[in-house]
Amino acid sequence: GDVYKRQDLGSFGLGCLQKDMENRMRKIITSLIAILVVTNLEAQQRTPKLVVCITVDQLRGDYIEYFYNTFGERGFKRLMNEGLVYNNIRFEFSDIDQASAFATLFTGSNPCFSGIAGDKTFDFEKEKEVSILNDPEYLGNYTKENYSPKNLFSSTIGDELKIASQGRSDVYSIAPDAESAILSAGHAANGAFWMDNTNGKWATTTYYKGIPWYVDRYNNGPESLASRLETMVWTPTLPMEKYDAFPYVLDDLPFRYTFSEKFANCYPNLKTSPFINKEINRLALQFLEYGGFGTRSCPDMLSITYYAGNYRGTMSKEYTREIQDTYYQLDQDIEKLLDTIDKKVGLANTLVVFTGSGYYKSEESYPDGLMVNGGEFHPKRCLALLNMYLMAIYGQHTSWVQGYYNNQIYLNRKAIEDAKLDLTTLQNKAAEFIQEFSGVQLVTTGRSLLTGDWNEGTAKFRQGTHHLRRGDLIIELQPGWKVNLDNPKEKVKIIRNNAVITPLVFMGNGLKPQHIYREVKATEVAPTVTHVLRIRPPNATQSLPLWELKIGN
């Protein structure tokens, strides 16, 4: 019996020992899992030291696909293979252009809130077109133009970063044009730089305080664009047989474009060639070399704009070798930029945001003899007939129509007020009259958009205009129709409502490669970036962050 008891107690002691070891092992494994999870989360969710926003004006996702076999491994392909890729972003308004697109991307709000509905606006008192950012209160540095972000009514990503860091973060932007440079920088940025159209120097506005010494040196030194201009010739980079993405190219001769200050529009033309992207890179590399990005206690931000549209803005034909060469060279420029970021700051410490502007200028004329549905809409004739119609109703003592600009008709508000007429009634009568014109698809009134009387068809007009600059009538023409301004200096515009595929890529900062085929809104970009930075979104943001980049996912 004693033996049995001793054996039983021994078995009991052994069982206790096994259980104790199991408990200890369980605790060790649990601790290891917790450490691994925390380490993984920290790797994925740390705040980046640098944010680089790369926006390509007129980027087309389908062109990236068409020209893919000509690209190297570390440009477009690196973005697509190593990034979190969204197949397409969508802008919620029509008539997208450079200014409205950039304002939307960097504020997270459509023009109805940001105030930026287009590159230009029309000053009817002075009877001239001016930049939406024109501001005579500020002088230009290295330019005679006057700009400021005063007409941008929303804060930007950079503004919120400056506020959160109490000014310690550096925020800069570089772009071909003033509109994209200033709108991607914002109100509180350290600086915004663009290429001046008359001297080719990197210009800015006195709204921003100070110019980095290396920008001054670049503008005035032996590396300046003016000192190299005569040697810059754009010819095919690849053998001619490599430009095989389009079967519609009929011209077998290689193209050749030169740039000289002797010719008018020298610098504007260069800004629509692949050389502008190389010049952008030259300056961006100066910032990365001397700007101390990623070394401060708070994150820094650098916004870069490339160009991927047609040469001279529009070409007389589409499917050209020029556009294929533009993308081929842009691929090399992206590769050089990413490699430099990796070397100077580290892509693991950098959030790269890559996307496009959501539109593409296409003004190809139809071949002779080819009939396509459509006609010509003449705004001047339309205004004259509308004024005669309103005179017949309200009297001939004044002109009731002020002007036309960018698919909008502006009535003479002062005359209407002096006559004590009801603006809503007059707008409605004018809209009913214009709706009868050939080629007019839809007309809506500014008053109806202001008071909330819109539907799915007219909501895009509300999103794409701001009430302070909105016309009394907004006109949408049928596809295929031409807008003829009866001005020999202005090109006839062909109405095309093509959707443009615009990819969105987030890369670096511990993000894992992934392809998302869900369409996202352009207003989701800014709040996503600020979420990764752990700061407030811009103050007019209309969307939430993309959930794939939310902290904790």
Outline where the language-model segments fall.
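Beta-strand elements within well-structured catalytic alpha/beta cores of enzymes
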Residues: P48-R60, L79, L105, L161, ...
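Secreted, luminal/periplasmic, and some membrane-associated catalytic domains
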Residues: N87, D97, K120-K144, A185-H187, ...
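Sec-dependent N-terminal signal peptides
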Residues: I28-V37
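Low-complexity, glycine/alanine/valine/leucine- and proline-rich hydrophobic stretches
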Residues: W481-H515
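Short, small-residue-biased leader/transition segments that mark boundaries at the very start
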Residues: G1-Y4, A43
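His/Asp/Glu-rich, glycine-adjacent segments
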Residues: N110, G115-C298, Y307-T314, S438, ...
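Non-catalytic, well-ordered alpha-helical segments in soluble enzyme domains
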Residues: K77, S154-I163, N406-V443, N509-G510, ...
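Short, structured active-site-proximal loop/turn typified by the sulfatase FGly-forming signature C/S-X-P-X-R
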Residues: I64-F113, D170-I174
